[in-house]
A protein has these predicted regions:
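Short, charged helix-to-loop "capping" segments that act as catalytic/coupling loops
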Residues: 31-39, 51-57
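Short, surface-exposed ligand-recognition loops at beta-strand->loop->(often short) alpha-helix junctions
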Residues: 17-30
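Glycine-rich beta-strand-turn "strand-cap" elements at beta-sheet edges
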Residues: 1-10, 48-59, 84-110
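Residue-level signal for secondary-structure boundary sites
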Residues: 24, 70-72, 106
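An amphipathic, aromatic/His-enriched active-site/gating alpha helix that lines ligand/cofactor pockets
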Residues: 5, 36-44, 65-100
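Short, well-ordered beta-strand segments in beta-rich or mixed alpha/beta enzyme
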Residues: 10-17, 48-79
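Residues within well-ordered alpha-helical secondary structure of globular protein domains
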Residues: 29-32, 78
Length: 110
């Protein structure tokens, strides 16, 4: 992978396919442990938890926005390109992924 080392903000998008019957528990963990984890790291600007409009859909998203790529690497270490799963998360999902995006300079927070 060719990584652009940029000073622009980085969105870290964690997507999970929820295991049957585990959606509420995974969302609780997002609101507690995932939120606490990113809030404890230097360089995290904000986070948000996204649920699908379709209540029967099995995907949920935890998105965090970081000051820059250096902040992401500092927070997650050598495994920054991989999903970080705290204890107890893996049994709540059948699949997950993490992707990183440069935040557009024209993005707004309205």
């Amino acid at each position: 992978m060719t990584v652009r080392n940029s000073s622009r903000p980085i969105a870290r998008v964690f997507r999970a396919t929820v295991a049957p019957g585990c959606r509420d528990e995974l969302l609780r963990k997002f609101h507690s442990s995932s939120a606490a984890l990113v809030n404890s790291k230097k360089g995290c600007l904000k986070y948000r938890i996204l649920e699908p409009v379709d209540a029967s859909a099995l995907e949920v998203v935890f998105e965090s926005v970081w000051q820059d790529l250096h902040a992401v690497k500092e927070a997650f270490g050598d495994g920054w390109e991989q999903s970080y799963l705290p204890e107890g998360y893996s049994v709540l999902m059948t699949a997950c992924s993490v992707h990183h995006f440069l935040v557009s300079e024209n993005s707004t927070t309205k």
